[in-house]
A protein has these predicted regions:
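Internal helical hairpin/lid segments
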Residues: 218, 222-275
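Membrane-interface helix-loop-helix junctions at boundaries between adjacent transmembrane segments
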Residues: 90-100, 108-169
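Hydrophobic alpha-helical transmembrane segments
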Residues: 164-170, 297-315
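N-terminal signal-anchor module of multipass membrane proteins
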Residues: 1-68, 74-79
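Helix-coil boundary and interhelical linker segments in multi-pass alpha-helical membrane proteins
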Residues: 1-22, 80-96, 147-162, 217-224
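Membrane-interfacial helix termini and the short, flexible loops that connect transmembrane helices
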Residues: 46-55, 83-89, 110-129, 183-193, ...
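Hydrophobic alpha-helical transmembrane segments in multi-pass integral membrane proteins
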Residues: 138-152, 206-217, 267-284
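Short, membrane-exposed interhelical loops at transmembrane-helix boundaries
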Residues: 281-300
Length: 333
């Protein structure tokens, strides 16, 4: 029988809970970057479309999903706060400007489509269309800047590493967005969307090289931090996934392309986690074992997460199943 005494005595089932929560934090971040990432990418692609019908198609494709996808950002923040409260406090106090910027961009991205649909006036829709694009581009850029600064332990919000990583994440969302729009909208969108996706994945690989080069100069351990076998394996896997993505997109295998984009997203987040570990707050030197909460709340949280996360995942399975398949001409945002 589980008792308070047993829960306070040691880790649940003798599991390495500190390391598991570290991995879970980054898995949640990767899930948000992928699921909301293709929404962001669709918003960026929206800027390249002149035809009103094509723009409405983009809005219809992401309409059922974008607000639900943002749940994963809340779960990420909640998990970081619950498991590593000192890290949460330090990160959010050092980078509060970035946090406000991310929230502002997310609000703009959510508000703009609603306002866009309220009036069919050219000037009105041009303004809110641009706002939608701005929110869709700024949100991943600022989130990437936050992740880059977190990795190198910079106390400043705007750095070279932040700009490079932010640009990398933004282009990665376009990669995901092109595959998602191909899957949901199909022939309702011009073929240029696929070409944008192929071009974006090439730019993404170039930015990955730029990111690794910047980290080699910025990280205290230098290039040695990037030459470990896990990092090299993740980079090689990313190259293979990028090639698979481009081939799949050209052949119209949009689901395969979207799966490849998911692999690229989780791979990028995994590189950050591997390079950072065992530290979780490089700015202060805190390592995972030092930053984790005490045994009793850690065990209770682990039980709660084991029960609740499958429920959240089930909700998303139901959501995506209910709105599966390509959108029809009758659907609107």
């Amino acid at each position: 029988m589980i008792s308070v005494e047993s829960l306070a005595a040691g880790p649940l089932l003798d599991l390495p809970l500190a390391e598991l929560w570290f991995a879970l934090i980054f898995a949640l971040l990767g899930t948000f970057l992928f699921l909301d990432g293709f929404d962001f990418g669709a918003g960026a692609i929206f800027a390249t479309l002149d035809d009103e019908s094509a723009r409405e198609t983009v809005l219809s494709a992401i309409g059922p999903f974008w607000d639900g996808n943002e749940v994963w950002l809340v779960v990420f923040g909640g998990a970081l706060f619950a498991a590593f409260p000192r890290v949460y406090a330090g990160l959010f106090s050092r980078h509060y400007l970035l946090m406000f910027g991310i929230l502002g961009a997310l609000i703009l991205r959510g508000l703009a489509p609603e306002m866009y649909e309220q009036r069919h006036d050219e000037r009105w829709q041009r303004w809110w269309g641009r706002s939608f694009v701005a929110g869709s581009v700024l949100a991943p850029f600022l989130l990437g800047a936050f992740a880059g600064n977190w990795l190198v332990g910079s106390p400043r919000s705007f750095t070279l590493v932040g700009i490079v990583v932010g640009s990398t994440v933004t282009v990665l969302t376009v990669v995901s967005g092109a595959a998602f729009l191909g899957l949901k909208a199909g022939r309702a969108l011009p073929g240029a969307v696929h070409r944008i996706g192929v071009g974006a994945v090439v730019v993404y690989l170039l930015l990955v090289v730029a990111t690794l080069g910047t980290l080699a100069v910025t990280l205290p351990a230098g290039a040695d931090a990037l030459l470990s076998m896990p990092v090299l394996a993740l980079v090689a896997a990313s190259i293979a996934l990028a090639i698979a993505y481009a081939v799949a997109l050209r052949r119209g295998a949009n689901l395969a392309a979207l799966v490849s984009a998911a692999g690229l997203t989780y791979g990028l987040v995994a590189v950050v986690a591997v390079v950072m570990y065992p530290r979780i707050d490089p700015a202060t030197g805190l390592v995972v074992e030092e930053a984790i909460v005490s045994t009793l709340p850690l065990n209770l949280m682990s039980i709660g997460a084991a029960l609740l996360l499958p429920l959240v995942a089930t909700y998303f399975v139901v959501l995506y199943s209910a709105f599966s398949g390509p959108i029809t001409a009758e659907e609107s945002y």
